[in-house]
Swiss-Prot record:
GTP binds at D63, M64, R65, S66. ATP binds at G13, M14, S15, G16, A17, G18, K19, T20. It comes from the Bacteria. InterPro entries: P-loop_NTPase, RapZ-like, RapZ-like_N, RapZ_C. Belongs to the RapZ-like family. SUPFAM superfamilies: P-loop containing nucleoside triphosphate hydrolases. Displays ATPase and GTPase activities. This is Nucleotide-binding protein SP_1566.
């Protein structure tokens, strides 16, 4: 049996350079993540990892919050170099002293190495102590001019494999405005201006997934015109959402009760987008009226 390879990214670097954002980014990329791993525990932890999937991936923040960091890290890295079945890289996050000082002042936190309270002194000492580790790092990212979003994008470009790059998923959902707009929606579209099947007795108790209602909604000229404009708006911007590192884009179609018009539109949009993207279709309020009637 072929031994599975473990992929490890050790995230380290200057305090305030963005390690928290980085570890969150790795989690979004499908890595198992741990923040503030004591260096001495790292080899033992890797031995205890139960490999359940092909090519398991770990991202661990190892930094100077562990008091033994500087005395242990070199020996630990030497041990990892000789460990079979392990592919590991060091990601070092850095930033200019001026920017680090500004970030500390913004958060009103003290630097862990600033014994006398002077932030700049702590930064200079940390930079001196971390210089050998920075020189060993395969990936050095300067976050001085990067926003958190830009850092996430940078890490996604460097550490996403082909499968991860294609993991962008679209959630297309319908909802009723009377029950509130979905709090997780990224894009919200209102179709309440269209003719409402609710006022036709033969369609009232059906939903937009049923053919008679779907045909009634979509066969109106204004429905087709709006849908074509909607598709022309959404399709060109999807690659940009993916490029920005967004893992899930939620598109919500709303009508009054979330039973007829929005359901039909969400159904059609999901079908069309699924030709080129990974799409999930959902209808939050489709059966809400039926459930209310049954309870009464």
């Amino acid at each position: 049996m072929t031994k599975k390879q473990l992929h490890l990214v050790i995230v380290t670097g200057m305090s305030g350079a963005g390690k928290t954002v980085a570890i969150q980014s790795f989690e979004d990329l499908g890595y198992f993540t741990i923040d503030n791993m004591p260096p001495a525990l790292l080899p033992k932890f890797l031995q205890l990892v139960e490999i359940k999937e092909d090519n398991p991936k770990l991202a661990l923040v190892v930094d100077m919050r562990s008091r033994s960091f500087f005395s242990e890290i070199q020996a630990v890295l030497d041990e990892l170099e000789n460990q079979d079945g392990l592919d590991f890289k060091i990601l070092f996050l850095d930033a200019a002293d001026k920017e680090l000082v500004a970030r500390y002042k913004e958060t009103r936190r003290s630097h862990p190495l600033a014994a006398d309270g002077r932030i700049l002194d702590g930064i200079k000492l940390e930079r001196e102590l971390l210089a050998p580790l920075k020189n060993m790092s395969q990936n050095v990212v300067d976050t001085t001019e990067l926003t958190p979003r830009e850092l996430r994008k940078t890490l996604a470009e460097q550490f996403s494999d082909q499968e991860q790059a294609q993991s962008f998923r679209i959630e297309v959902m319908s909802f009723g405005f009377k029950y509130g707009i979905p709090i997780d929606a990224d894009l919200v579209f209102d179709v309440r201006f269209l003719p409402n099947p609710y006022y036709l007795p033969e369609l009232r108790n059906q939903t937009g997934v049923d053919e008679p209602v779907y045909d009634y909604v979509m066969n109106h000229p204004e429905s087709e015109d709006f849908y074509q404009h909607l598709l022309a708006l959404i399709e060109p911007i999807l690659p940009s959402y993916q490029k920005e590192g967004k893992s899930v884009l939620t598109i919500a179609m709303g009508c009054t009760g979330g039973q007829h018009r929005s359901v039909a539109f969400a159904k059609r949009l999901a079908q069309d987008l699924s030709k080129n993207w990974s799409v999930n279709e959902g209808h939050r309020d489709k059966d809400r009226r039926k459930e209310t009637v049954n309870r009464s």
